[in-house]
Each structure stands twice: as structure tokens, then as C-alpha cells.
Amino acid sequence: MLLSKHDYASLFGPTIGDSVRLADTELWIRIEKDFTVYGEEVKFGGGKVIRDGMGQGQMSSKDCVDLVLTNAVILDYWGIIKADIGINNGRISGIGKAGNPDVQPNVTISIGPGTEIIAAEGKIVTAGGIDAHVHFICPQQVEEALCSGITTFIGGGTGPATGSNATTCTPGPWFISRMLQVADTLPINIGVTGKGSASFPDALEEQIIAGAIGLKVHEDWGATPAAIDCCLNVADRFDIQVSMHTDTLNESGFVEDTLSAIKGRTVHAYHTEGAGGGHSPDIIRMCGFSNVLPSSTNPTMPYTVNTIDEHLDMMMICHNLNPNLPEDMAFSESRIRRETIAAEDVLHDLGALSMISSDSQAMGRVGEVILRTWQTAHKMKQQRGSLLGDATRYDDNVRVKRYIAKYTINPAITHGISHEVGSVEIGKLADLVLWSPVFFGVKPELIIKGGMIISSVMGDPNASIPTPQPVHYRLMFGARGKAKHATRMTFLSQVAYNSELTDYLKLVSLIGEVRHCRNIQKKHMINNSWQPVIEVDSQTYQVRANGELLTCEPASVLPMSQRYFLF
């Protein structure tokens, strides 16, 4: 007997050809393929399939997986599909059909007595997000980010020091060692970036040897051509990434001078629009070069009626400026331009800007990377219509795959960790986020880290069931005790990874090495590799890409906002 579409979806979730709305946006995803077998779907519960001799076989743990997410809709840069997900030893081991191969056909993921189940029927599963622009100002950022769906931090800092409030630099071997020891205790993947503003290499090299996975050149420490060249020379020798926040005041040169100093070498250009910093008014031109991997930070995303007003105060606090000094006011005002902020939304939609990050507590919000990414995608669909390849009103797969890559696979590629994290693919760390479609991008249901639930929406612990109020996010068993060391990863430079650093610092978490940072280009930014010729009018600040004016109106209303947040 065939089930009706409605009955089937209510039991097993949507299948091939079905469309799912994302939160209260105008974005829809359409299922492209279904790996589950009709009539042989596995489902856990009373009177359901995953029982001894039925959907559960007799095999021992070596022949079955530790965890299965059943009937999930996987949303990733490579596709939007329906499948079961198998996890073994904290890593994704299978994407396909789960069940008992003794009695069911086409089983690729075996369920046994040693298998746990997470019911993902009607749910969306994405890779844990990667925030590649984090100021380590307070450790409480970690829980805030986890509860939004972020599972990896890349950045620098030492706490609420003045330098860390402004720059993502953990300066020097001593501070890098301390921050690596702190990272070992936090339930999130972390890679630390050192200070790259120096004209001689010795002080940079010792930071990489101490474990830094990258270096940050920042105008507040000095972003001169000499410092840029020196930093990139060191990066090329050690295969690490250079993140760059260039010279807003154009004191030591203009954007052309910075590009000349870079000499075609790969850089990660932070907040490429410029409100977060960089050559005024035309730093946005850098997103058109093959060696520049451009990103945005979330306070300008998307462009709204409130964006301009809130930036001045943020600038004063984060960069230790004085509103009573005319030159400090001029510095701030030179960075806040309606025209380039408006163009930023469009450049993201066209795939010219490749990544989105937070700039946490330093002109950015650590818990809103994912939220603001999808708000921007919605705003662009409203203002610009469907993208080429999105066939119908209920199919935004091209746009959705473009935007999810901005905070998952592309920052992973940029910083040399895509072999470990950044996508829902076999062999990678099982950092997964489970969403109810109505809460997609806003409030995840479960955050899985290294194969174990690390954070979840949870009701009163004294209640008879898990759901009574007060319901809020709570850290779970995966975030506690020694379990957190088996489910999180600290990333190190190759030279540190191959040394005795982990023993010296007594690090006990999983350790990953960064690799292939220097041989990547814009063309490797998945679904976000467009390289237009960008021109910025120095008087009006209007932005053109290949001669076409790029602009959009500020939003006065956004989805994924007050409807979901009472306070």
C-alpha cells in the first residue's frame, strides 16, 4: 500500500522532489536525491522498525556504527539529499541506507545492539559552522556560539585585553601556549592565530613553532607593505594562512600598494567591505583578485535601516578611540559607507565574497553568523529574485548551497582544516547540527560534536519528560569531563604538530594539523569563486562590478528575528 505524500512526510520526512521552507524566510530547499529505500525506511520507537531481528541486526560493534541519524535531510555545499547518517568513533562513516543487512536490501550502514539512534525525520542536518574571525575576549563565547550551530573557532586573543578587543592576535609563544591550554578545556574546535605585524621574521616564526595556525596582520599593530611582505614570506615557509586587516587611513600606502606587497600570494582578507577596517574607501576591490580569499563580518550583514547608526559606537569601543577627538571621529566615519555596505550584500549573492564570520565582541556577534547569513540570502531573494539555476519559487538550492558554503567548507579550505571539518562527508569529524525546519538558522535542536551530543534545547531536569519549561540550551554530556577531549580538536601548525608541543603543554584533546594553505586561490572557494573587476568611485563610493552598479535598499523588516526571540 502506498502512503499519501502527507502521511509519508509525517512518518519519514520529505523525499525526492519535495520542498522545505527554511524558517520564516522566502527560501526553499528541494530534495535532490533520496538514499533511503521506500518501504524499508528505519525508524526508532514503540512498534517501529529498529528492533532486534528487524531493523537492528546481531553484529558486534566492529561491524556496526555507534550512532545513526535516521531519515535526515542533509543540506551541504555538495547537495541537498535525504539519507541516513552513520557515525563511528566520532567521525562520519556512512551516508546512505541504514538498517539490518540480514533482512533488508541495499543497506550501507549497519545497525546493531551497539548503535544509538537520533530520529532526524523531518529535520535538517548541516555541518557545524566555522567562525574564522574570532576575538578570544571571553570564554563564554564558546557556549553562545555552540548554541547557534558553530563548532569551530579560528582567531586570536588573550581575554579582554585592549589588544584583543581590537585584533585577533594571540601574541608571542607564552600567550599562545596558555591559550592552547585553555582551548584544551573548551568544548569547541579551536585554532589560534598569532600576531603577524612585524618587518623581521624571527618573532613570527617562533609563534608558528609555538602552535599558531596562522598570522594576523592588522592596522592597529601596523599593516605596512614591509610587514605584509615579511608575514607572507614566513607563511609560505610554514604553510599557514595570513589573515589581513589593512590600512584604513592609507598612511603607509593605498590598496594598490597592499596588493603590490602581497605579490600574488594567498591571503584571507577580513571584512573586505571595509566597515570593519581596511583601505578607505576601496578595500572592497580586493574581492576581485584570484589570490584573495574574501570574507565579511556579520554586523554589516544584511544591510538594514539600523546598520549605519550602530557602527560608530562599536568602532569607538573596539579600537580604543576617543569621540572627543576630531581625528578619531574622522577615522571612524571614513570606514562607514552606505554604498559599499549595500554592495556587500549583492557581492555575496553573486558569489564574489566567499565567507562570513563574526568578529566576536569586536564589532561582531559570535552567536549570529548563521542567522545573518540566511537573513542575507532571504533579503537578496526578495530584492534580486531567484538565481540562475533555481528553477521554481520552491527551489532555491543554488542560492542555499552558495550561502551555506560561506560558513562551513570555505573557511575550512582557507585555513587548511577541510580534511577534518567543514562539511557532511565521510571521514570527517562528526560535527553536525540538527534543525527543525521552522527554526532553521535560528535555534538548532541538537549540536553534535565529534559524534556526541554536546548541546541541546532541554527542559526542566526535574520533569518527568525532557520538554517542560523552562526550556533553554544546556551543555550535555559530550561537553563535560574527559568526554569533551575525545569530541573536540585543537588545530596546530605542521611544525608544532610534528614536535613534542602537545606533550610539553600536556594537551589531551584530539590534535589536527593545518595543511595546504598556500596553494589555494579564489577558484577553490566553493560556490563563491566569482572574480569581477571592482571599481569604487572615490567621491560617491558607488561600487561597480564589471561596469555594473551594485546596490540594494536597506531592509526595514527581516525574518528570523522578533518572531523567534521574546527578549
From Swiss-Prot:
Residues 128-567 form the Urease domain. The modification N6-carboxylysine is found at K216. It is found in: Cytoplasm. Its cofactor is Ni cation. GO terms for biological process: urea catabolic process. CDD domains: Urease_alpha (cd00375). It is an enzyme of class 3 (hydrolase). GO terms for cellular component: cytoplasm. Ni(2+) 2 binds at K216, H245, H271. Keywords: Cytoplasm, Hydrolase, Metal-binding, Nickel. It comes from the Bacteria. Substrate binds at H218. GO terms for molecular function: nickel cation binding; urease activity. The active site is at H319 (proton donor). Pathway: Nitrogen metabolism; urea degradation; CO(2) and NH(3) from urea (urease route): step 1/1. Its EC number is 3.5.1.5. Carboxylation allows a single lysine to coordinate two nickel ions. Ni(2+) 1 binds at H133, H135, K216, D359. It catalyses: urea + 2 H2O + H(+) = hydrogencarbonate + 2 NH4(+). Gene3D superfamilies: Metal-dependent hydrolases, Urease, subunit C, domain 1. Signal peptide: none annotated. Binds 2 nickel ions per subunit. InterPro entries: Amidohydro-rel, Metal-dep_hydrolase_composite, Metal_Hydrolase, Urease_alpha_N_dom, Urease_alpha_subunit, Urease_AS, Urease_asu, Urease_asu_c. Belongs to the metallo-dependent hydrolases superfamily. Urease alpha subunit family. Heterotrimer of UreA (gamma), UreB (beta) and UreC (alpha) subunits. Three heterotrimers associate to form the active enzyme. This is Urease subunit alpha. It comes from Blochmanniella pennsylvanica (strain BPEN).
